[in-house]
C-alpha cells in the first residue's frame, strides 16, 4: 500500500493519503491530545479535506481510521457545551456535527470506518455515517453512545442512524442505557460487519472499501419497527415502561431519546435529525445535564490526582487478611483489575475456600458471557492463592485487612504483619467504623498504616475512602508515600478514591447514618416500609433506606451507631429498633430475615416486623415530605464534614456521596444540590424540621454562615 501525503499547511485533525489502488485514507489524529475527541472547529477541517476528494476521479473507496495507538474517537469534547448560553447555541453545535457526518455519508464511494479502541458518542456517530464498519477484536475496543449518562442524547445523527442499522429495540437498549459493546457483541448486532485481529484491521478495511457500497439489508424487525405502527408502538411502550421504572421521571434525556427516535421513524431522516438537534439543545440547558456533566469533569480530574505529593511505591504482590465477602471482593479487584498476584490469609480453610469460590463465580459469569476465555479464567484464578498461615506473605508490598470489626483483633493483625513482612509493607485496614489511629497504635511502623474503606459488593461499588491517620502517641502519621501508594492501587482496582480524615464514620458512613436513622424514625412514626422506600426511590436514590438496612445488615448498623454517638453526639442517636430486630435474629438478607421477606418470588415486606415493633402501619406523610426529611439530615452532615475538614472539597463530598451511597446523580451530589436550593433555603427547611422533629435538624454553623453571606459551595 503506497500512500502520498496531501499538502496541508494548517495543523489539522484530519489528513488524507491516497493509495495506488484507488483507496483514500482519512486519518483522524487530534494534535497534542492523547485521545481523539471531536470539536466544532472540525467541520471546516473536514470540509477542506473532502474538497480534496472532489479533484480525484479515480477513488474507489475510503478508510477512516485513527492515528492514535489505542483509541478511535472517545466522543465529542463536552467542554464545548459549557460555553453555550442558550438552547439555540447548543442546537447549532449538534447541527454542525450532523452536517459534518452528512458530508461523509454523501460521498459517492464506499466509506469504511476501521475502529480500534474506544469508539464512543460522537465517535460512533461518525462511524455510523460511514457505509461500513470493521473493528478490532481487542479488549480495548468499545462501541457505545453514552450521552444519556451526561443527561443528553446523541446529537449528531446517532438517534436516527442506529435504529435503522440494528433495529429499534437494540438501538433503544444501547442509547437509553449508554452501554458500551465489545467487538463480538457489536458484530452480532450488526453494528460492525467484521471483528478482526488488530494486525489485519486496516487490510480488511481496505478490502471492504474496494467493494461497492453495501445495500441496506431489510429485515422483518426493521419493517415492523419502521413501517408498522402497531409493532413500533409495542416496542416503544415497553421501553418507556422499563425506562420509567429505572429513572422514575428524574432524567429528562431518557424521555427525549424515546421521543426523538419515534419521531424520526414516523417523519423520516431529515425531520428526525432536526428534532434530534432541537432536543439536544434543550437538554444541554437542563439542571440534570449540568449536574451529570459536573460529575464527569470531577471524576476526570480525580484520575490525575495522587492524594499526595509523594511518588507511589512499586507494588508487585498484595496480601488480603480475611476470606469473607469483603476479602473475596478485594482480592478479586486486586487480581483481575489491578493485575497483582494476591495471597489470602484466613483462620480457616473454609474461609479460603469461600474467597476462591467467590472469585471463581465472578469470573465464570464473565466466561459464560464470553468476556473472557476459559484459559483467561484459569490464569486469573492461578493469581489468587490462600492459606491459614502467613506462608507467601514475606514479599507482599501491601496487606489489606478485612477481618471482624474488633480493635484487639486488628491490633493482632498489625503485629503479625509487621513480624511477617518487610519494613516497607503497607498495612491498609478496611474498617468501616474504627479510627485508624487506634489501629495504628499497635504498630511499630505507624507511618505504614492507613485506612482503605471499600463498599460492598466490592466488585461493583466504585468508591474507596483512603484514610491517613495523624499519628499515634508513640509514632508518626501515615506517610505521604503510603497515601500515594494506596491511591494508585485503588485506581488500578478500578476505584475512585477520595482521601478523607480519620474521624468517626469517615465521610460516607457519617452522612449515611443520620439519613438511615431518620428513615427508621419515620418507620417508628407508623409509615409503611414500602412507602418509605418508594419515597426515596422516587427522589432518586437507587435503593430505599429500609431495603439498604436489610442489605448492609442490621448488625452492622447496630455496631457503627454507638461509635458515632460517642464521638459525634446526640444527633447520631439511633431509634430503638436495632436491639429489637437483633433479638428476633433479623439481620437482614444475610440471615434471611429482616424488614423484607426473602426466598420469595416477589419483593414483599415481612409484615410480622410491625408486630415486633408494636406498630400499626398507616400512610400519612407525602412521599416528597419523607424524602426531604431523610435527605436534609444527610445534607446538614455533609456540610459539617466539609467544615471540619473530613473531606477536602465539595467536589470530593459530591463524588463520595454519589459513588458511595448512590446520592441521585442528576442532582450532582449533596453540595451541588444545596447550591441549587440555595443555602438560605436549606437553612429555612432545617429550621422548619427542627420545630417539627427536634434538635437533630439544627442547621450547622457552616450553612448558617453561608446563608447569611449568600455564599455557595461552588463558585
Swiss-Prot record:
Stretches for region 3-hydroxyacyl-CoA dehydrogenase: 313-715
Source superkingdom: Bacteria
Gene Ontology BP annotations: fatty acid beta-oxidation
Segments for region (Enoyl-CoA hydratase): 8-197
Pfam families: 3HCDH, 3HCDH_N, ECH_1
Family the entry assigns: In the N-terminal section; belongs to the enoyl-CoA hydratase/isomerase family.
Cited function: Catalyzes the formation of a hydroxyacyl-CoA by addition of water on enoyl-CoA. Also exhibits 3-hydroxyacyl-CoA epimerase and 3-hydroxyacyl-CoA dehydrogenase activities.
This protein's name: Fatty acid oxidation complex subunit alpha
Lineage: Bacteria, Pseudomonadati, Pseudomonadota, Gammaproteobacteria, Vibrionales
Gene that encodes the chain: fadJ
